[in-house]
UniProtKB/Swiss-Prot annotation:
One of its GO terms (cellular component) is extracellular region. SUPFAM superfamilies: Phospholipase A2, PLA2. The active site is at 48, 92. Its EC number is 3.1.1.4. Keywords: Calcium, Disulfide bond, Hydrolase, Lipid degradation, Lipid metabolism, Metal-binding, Secreted. PANTHER family: PHOSPHOLIPASE A2, PHOSPHOLIPASE A2 FAMILY MEMBER. Monomer. This is Basic phospholipase A2 4. It holds the Pfam family Phospholip_A2_1. SMART domains: PA2c. GO terms for biological process: arachidonate secretion; lipid catabolic process; phospholipid metabolic process.
Length: 118
């Protein structure tokens, strides 16, 4: 679910950037999404949005699905055997790892999406 996703983000980036920094970034980080991603980090969000879309097609509710994960010393891992929990955790885990390895550009935070996301 979205709360667990927030924790996975913190785990993957070892607390270097608070999760809320990703809630209004570029064209895809946060609610909705359109146009061309502005950078690598925004592409992570587009991929995550698409992953959630696939989860919904499978009959899952990704924003609400609770799953099991472990925040280890190397990186977070998912601990779910089957179904929606496994799929949604994988979506969130891949996005969190993608966020951690992608540069954050302050100029792409809280942009005018009506102009830059066509």
């Amino acid at each position: 679910n979205l709360v667990q996703f927030s924790y996975l983000i913190q785990c993957a980036n070892t607390g270097k950037r608070a999760s809320y920094h990703y809630a209004d970034y570029g064209c895809y980080c946060g609610a909705g999404g359109s146009g061309t991603p502005v950078d690598e980090l925004d592409r992570c969000c587009k991929i995550h949005d698409n992953c959630y879309g696939q989860a919904e097609k499978m009959g899952c509710y990704p924003k609400l699905t609770m799953y099991n994960y472990y925040c280890g010393t190397q990186s977070p891992t998912c601990d779910n055997k089957t179904g929606c929990q496994r799929y949604v955790c994988a979506c969130d885990l891949e996005a969190a790892k993608c966020f951690a390895r992608s540069p954050y550009n302050n100029k792409n935070y809280n942009i005018d999406t009506s102009k830059r996301c066509k």
